[in-house]
């Protein structure tokens, strides 16, 4: 009983924070407008790469974490894409390696911010994939208990929070400051090769 009440309390807090951030984003966009440092195409490319960790997260824990209207929204918006992604897991693997060598390592000439965001999206994808695979390797009895539910909830919240924050920073044309993940992404793009002048 207390777990259900605590879950609803956490959901209300997350929704309040989300609404507050949404209002702040709308105010900031209306005040400043979008910065011209990144083009719309570059931003869309970054948004597309942040979809990869979302698909991976939804594959591992989406239906188990979501319920009610969120599950209906999930089925209408991402459900078919997640089914294709989970049916052919080699697609995510191929996208990961192709984008790493083409964009992050500098075969294609793109701006450093784009390389940073693509690298960060790939790192979040890799972490989500590893943690999700480890959780799926646990016995079913553990996953059905409170420990498994808590682990899936934490994976979902951390992945979605990171992706939402990073997408907000892409929208503003800025770099993110996620602990450890941003530092690893900076290390990947600091060599200066493949940078668009």
UniProtKB/Swiss-Prot annotation:
Has keyword Transcription regulation? no
Record flagged with keyword Phosphoprotein: no
This entry carries the following GO cellular component terms, namely: chloroplast membrane
The protein's name in its UniProt record: Tic20 family protein Ycf60
Q: What is its main location?
A: plastid
Q: Where in the cell is it found?
A: Plastid, Chloroplast membrane
Task: Give the record's family classification.
Answer: Belongs to the Tic20 family.
Q: What InterPro entries does the record tag this protein with? A: Tic20
Membrane spanning segments where?
A: 3-23, 47-66, 81-101, 118-138, 141-161
Q: Which UniProt keywords apply?
A: Chloroplast, Membrane, Plastid, Transmembrane, Transmembrane helix
Look up and give the membrane topology term.
Multi-pass membrane protein
- Domain of life assignment: Eukaryota
Per UniProt, what is the name of the gene that codes for the protein in this document?
A: ycf60
């Amino acid at each position: 009983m207390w777990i259900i009440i605590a879950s609803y309390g956490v959901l209300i807090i997350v929704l309040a924070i989300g609404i507050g951030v949404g209002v702040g984003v709308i105010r900031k966009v209306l005040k400043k407008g979008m910065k011209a440092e990144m083009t719309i195409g570059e931003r869309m490319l970054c948004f597309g790469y942040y979809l990869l960790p979302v698909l991976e997260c939804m594959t591992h824990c989406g239906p188990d974490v979501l319920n009610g209207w969120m599950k209906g929204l999930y089925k209408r918006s991402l459900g078919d894409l997640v089914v294709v992604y989970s049916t052919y897991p080699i697609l995510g693997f191929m996208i990961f390696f192709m984008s790493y060598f083409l964009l992050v390592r500098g075969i294609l000439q793109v701006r450093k911010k784009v390389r940073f965001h693509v690298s960060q999206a790939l790192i979040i994808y890799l972490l989500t994939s590893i943690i999700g695979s480890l959780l799926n390797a646990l016995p079913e009895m553990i996953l059905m208990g409170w420990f498994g539910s808590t682990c899936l909830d934490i994976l979902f919240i951390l992945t979605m929070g990171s992706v939402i924050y990073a997408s907000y920073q892409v929208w503003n044309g800025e770099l993110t400051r996620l602990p450890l993940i941003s530092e690893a992404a900076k290390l990947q793009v600091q060599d200066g090769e493949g940078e668009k002048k």
